[in-house]
Amino acid sequence: MKQDLHPKYTKVTVNCANCGNSFETRSTRPSIKVDICNNCHPFYTGKQMLVDTAGRVERFNKRFAKSTAAQAKAQ
């Protein structure tokens, strides 16, 4: 059998970018950074997070109105 075939499996610290929570696990990577963890995820906390979609919907409606106006003008 070949020696040193598998990567080293060591303890690493996982850091959450959202809440700053950190915990230890094992991995082949030197460090792990996650966007959201069990400490701040809405499913685990029971808190609803407001997602800013209103601005996107308004922008879409504005672009859609421009395209329909251009089509009506062309006909």
UniProtKB/Swiss-Prot annotation:
GO biological process, one term: translation
InterPro entries: Ribosomal_bL28/bL31-like_sf, Ribosomal_bL31, Ribosomal_bL31_A, Ribosomal_bL31_sf
GO cellular component, one term: ribosome
Pfam families found in the cross-reference section: Ribosomal_L31
Keyword Ribosomal protein in record: yes
PROSITE patterns the record matches: RIBOSOMAL_L31
Functional description taken from the UniProt entry: Binds the 23S rRNA.
Protein's UniProt name: Large ribosomal subunit protein bL31
Protein species of origin: Chlorobium phaeobacteroides (strain DSM 266 / SMG 266 / 2430)
